[in-house]
Every structure is written in C-alpha cells, then in structure tokens.
C-alpha cells in the first residue's frame, strides 16, 4: 500500500492515508494518457465552421461576358473561387471531430495520471474541505496554510453539497485553481451502487501541479477504479 500524509484544513498533519497500489502506484503509461487527452480535447471541438461553395454564394447565375471574341479569359460565373467574393474551393464544412476511446484505456489513463502525481509527491489528501460561504478570501487562506501560493491546484470533491459548492466558487477568482465535484445526480455517501467519478479527468490532473483530494474522494476513486 502506498501511504501519504493526511492533513486538516489548517495544513496540519493529522495522520496518514493509505492508497491502493493498483490505482495510485502503477507505472504511468504516457502513451495512453496522451490518447486520453487527445480524445478529451476532441470532444470540445464544436465542428461548426462552414464556408460557402460557388453554388451556395448568392448571385453569379449570369455569365459575366460571352465566351469568345472579347480577348479576355473565359468565365461562367462571378462566384467562381478565383473571383473576389466568389465561393471557397475545398473549404471547411461542419463535421464531428469527436474520437472514441475504450473504457479500459480511460481507466488506465486515469490510474496513470494519479500515479504520476503520487510519484511526484503532488497528491495531498485532506480529511475534509468545506466553506460556509463562497469567498475568495477563504480559498486564499487555505492555500496559504499549505504553502501553495502561485501553484496550479486541482481540488476534487466527492459529493454535491453546499460546502463543496462554496469551495468550487471560491476558486473562480484565483488563476490556476480549479475545483471538480466528481459526482453524478443521485449519488450519495450511502448509495455507492451508482457511484461514478464524473468530472475527474486526465487533462485537468496533468494541467495542474497539485492534486488535492478529500478522504472520501480517495475512497470513491478506489471504489470506481478498483
């Protein structure tokens, strides 16, 4: 079992937390992580760019001049791609850029990203995090207690509840900070049969230097990925 220190919200060590080796301490597969990030970014592409061909541009139905005896080049329409204000030849059209990735590769990529952060010593486990109000000052005090000023930090929280929502909102005005509530509608601490970790993704883990997990979130990750 891998072991990390367990902290409270004041940045004080209060114990240790065991992490499953098959999730947090595997040999990172960088190829699979790259494939996951490529897959994830492909889902963000709107694919709505569109250009008009010569047949779609308004006008140009009349031949600009007769075919012969003018001394000029032959043209059939002023909307030809070689004309100003003409249509576009071989231009982009709306398309679906999304890619597919097998479930096993998604799991392996998540495990690899978590293991990479563990090997770097950048996983911080907190017994619990919660704010009574969504104020930037609360978050600044928290990151100061841990000595993380100027770091890119990803907070991953397990359940939808007001204290966690306040943590998420408190991150918004501080560059480099992001909070994810890795939950799905209907999931609760008591109802583990439908537990998922929606929102937890490889791109965000790799895009932030520090990964802060609550104790419940560690248990949830091990339940889903185990």
Swiss-Prot record:
The keyword Ribosomal protein applies. It comes from Pseudothermotoga lettingae (strain ATCC BAA-301 / DSM 14385 / NBRC 107922 / TMO) (Thermotoga lettingae). Residues 52-71 are annotated as: Disordered. This is Large ribosomal subunit protein uL4. Belongs to the universal ribosomal protein uL4 family. It holds the Pfam family Ribosomal_L4. PANTHER family: 50S RIBOSOMAL PROTEIN L4, LARGE RIBOSOMAL SUBUNIT PROTEIN UL4M. One of the primary rRNA binding proteins, this protein initially binds near the 5'-end of the 23S rRNA. It is important during the early stages of 50S assembly. It makes multiple contacts with different domains of the 23S rRNA in the assembled 50S subunit and ribosome. Forms part of the polypeptide exit tunnel. The keyword Phosphoprotein does not apply. InterPro entries: Ribosomal_uL4, Ribosomal_uL4-like, Ribosomal_uL4_dom_sf. Part of the 50S ribosomal subunit. The lineage of its organism: Bacteria, Thermotogati, Thermotogota, Thermotogae, Thermotogales.
């Amino acid at each position: 079992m891998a072991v990390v220190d367990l902290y409270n919200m004041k940045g004080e060590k209060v114990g240790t937390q065991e992490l499953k080796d098959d999730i947090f301490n595997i040999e990172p597969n960088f190829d699979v992580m790259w494939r996951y990030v490529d897959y994830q970014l492909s889902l963000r592409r709107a694919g709505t760019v569109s250009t008009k061909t010569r047949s779609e541009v308004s006008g140009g139905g009349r031949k600009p001049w007769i075919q012969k005896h003018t001394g000029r080049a032959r043209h059939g329409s002023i909307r030809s791609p070689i004309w100003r204000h003409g249509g576009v030849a071989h231009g982009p059209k709306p398309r679906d850029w999304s890619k597919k990735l097998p479930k096993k590769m998604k799991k392996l990529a998540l495990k690899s990203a978590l293991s990479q952060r563990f090997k770097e010593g950048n996983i911080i486990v907190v017994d619990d995090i919660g704010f009574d109000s969504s104020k930037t000052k609360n978050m600044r005090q928290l990151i100061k207690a841990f000595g993380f000023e100027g770091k890119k930090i990803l907070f991953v929280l397990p359940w939808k509840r007001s204290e966690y929502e306040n943590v998420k909102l408190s991150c918004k005005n501080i560059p480099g900070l992001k909070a994810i509530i890795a939950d799905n509608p209907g999931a609760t601490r008591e109802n583990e049969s439908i537990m998922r970790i929606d929102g937890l993704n490889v791109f965000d883990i790799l895009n932030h230097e520090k990964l802060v997990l609550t104790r419940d979130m560690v248990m949830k990750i091990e339940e889903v990925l185990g």
